[in-house]
């Protein structure tokens, strides 16, 4: 039966048109890594298109949409589109957006870790905003024969504005499918031992290559998480507590105290109060207080992006130096580090239990 022969009224139905279903014993399994998203190009037009989608999400901006859309379209997009495009252009890689490049490397690095009794575990990625969209990739996975999908957000700490909205988009796509795959979700892994180990290894390896801060002389390690409005904490979002939990476990793994290590929150947007202390003012204060060296690491970002490369590496660095600091280090995110790839495989394996697939670790892939 050709889709061309289907009556037009059938194409306007609520559910997506699908080919006839055939019984299969394969039960192919897919692991879908989900990240926030990125513009397709470092141009004002592409950035405005991306920001319009991102900032129109009611889980991201929780104010009445009629009021917000007027502000967004008349003030924010015209002003921020061009300014943000310049920032993206400064960090753009030859292969494309840093977030997309590092996410693709994560996918390609994780694939060798999965094997299953004659079946292959499909590993792919999608973005909540921009391309490739969650809906498009779920449709591709279905066409590839995936009957079971594990949604694995690249957000270690749960938040309504990140994890929940990614699940919203996935379930909305499923809601348009007549023949839905079975789906599981990973809510968070803020305290997962493999994730904490990967963070600690990333810091240790950076220090092995660039020298360890002189903590006895007052140097500091700053753990900077993405901020959210403080009212979300008051409304019951667990994000703040999970960030603090991750930070405490990482400090313990590194053998550091709260005197040597600070926890801050970055990327504040708008005039409302967000989670504090804020990253940039904290670094400026540290510089003014005579701290010679500050290392900044972003545990909540699993891949480097505009917020880590430009905001931390340039803007926050300048605040520290202008405050009087002498030596600033931005420790790269987990990206495709061997310890993080092994952790992704372990987290996925735990959440695939009970499905007809066995997850095997390939030693050569994590050595």
From Swiss-Prot:
What keywords would UniProt list here?
Cytoplasm, Heme biosynthesis, Iron, Lyase, Metal-binding, Porphyrin biosynthesis
PROSITE patterns (alphabetical): FERROCHELATASE
What's an example GO cellular component term for this entry?
cytoplasm
Q: Does the keyword Metal-binding apply?
A: yes
E.C. number:
4.98.1.1
Pathway membership, UniProt: Porphyrin-containing compound metabolism; protoheme biosynthesis; protoheme from protoporphyrin-IX: step 1/1
Q: Which InterPro entries match?
A: Ferrochelatase (IPR001015), Ferrochelatase_AS (IPR019772), Ferrochelatase_C (IPR033644), Ferrochelatase_N (IPR033659)
Name the catalysed reactions.
heme b + 2 H(+) = protoporphyrin IX + Fe(2+)
Where does it reside?
Cytoplasm
Look up keyword Flavoprotein and say if it applies: no
An individual GO BP term? heme biosynthetic process
Primary site of residence: cytoplasm
Family of this protein: Belongs to the ferrochelatase family.
Protein's job: Catalyzes the ferrous insertion into protoporphyrin IX.
This chain belongs to which protein, by name? Ferrochelatase
């Amino acid at each position: 039966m050709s889709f061309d022969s289907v009556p037009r009224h059938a194409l306007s139905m609520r559910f997506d048109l699908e080919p006839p279903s055939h019984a299969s014993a394969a039960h192919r399994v897919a692991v879908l890594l989900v990240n926030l998203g990125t513009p397709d190009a470092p141009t004002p037009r592409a950035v405005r298109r991306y920001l319009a989608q991102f900032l129109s999400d009611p889980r991201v901006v929780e104010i009445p949409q009629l009021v917000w859309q007027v502000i967004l379209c008349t003030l924010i997009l015209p002003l921020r589109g061009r300014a943000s495009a310049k920032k993206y252009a400064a960090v753009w890689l030859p292969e494309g957006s840093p977030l997309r490049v590092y996410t693709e490397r994560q996918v390609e690095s994780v694939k060798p870790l999965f094997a299953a009794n004659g079946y292959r575990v499909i590993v792919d990625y999608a973005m909540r905003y921009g391309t490739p969209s969650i809906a498009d990739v779920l449709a591709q996975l279905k066409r590839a024969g995936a009957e079971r999908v594990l949604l694995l957000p690249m957000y270690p700490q749960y938040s309504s504005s990140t994890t929940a909205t990614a699940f919203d988009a996935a379930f909305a796509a499923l809601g348009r499918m007549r023949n839905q795959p079975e789906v599981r979700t990973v809510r968070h892994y803020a305290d997962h031992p493999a994730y904490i180990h990967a963070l600690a290894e990333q810091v240790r390896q950076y220090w092995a290559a660039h020298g360890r801060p002189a903590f006895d002389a007052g140097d500091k390690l700053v753990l900077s998480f993405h901020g959210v409005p403080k009212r979300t904490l008051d409304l019951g979002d667990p994000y703040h507590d999970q960030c603090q939990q991750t930070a405490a476990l990482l400090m313990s793994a590194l053998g550091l105290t709260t005197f040597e290590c600070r926890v801050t929150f970055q990327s504040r947007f708008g005039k409302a109060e967000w989670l504090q202390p804020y990253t940039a003012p904290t670094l400026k204060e540290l510089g003014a207080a005579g701290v010679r060296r500050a290392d900044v690491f972003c545990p909540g970002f699993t891949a480097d992006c505009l917020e880590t490369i430009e905001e931390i590496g340039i803007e926050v660095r300048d605040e520290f130096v202008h405050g009087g600091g002498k030596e600033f280090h931005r420790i790269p995110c987990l990206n495709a580090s061997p310890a993080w790839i092994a952790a992704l495989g372990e987290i996925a394996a735990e959440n695939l239990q009970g499905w007809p697939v066995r997850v095997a670790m390939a030693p050569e892939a994590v050595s």
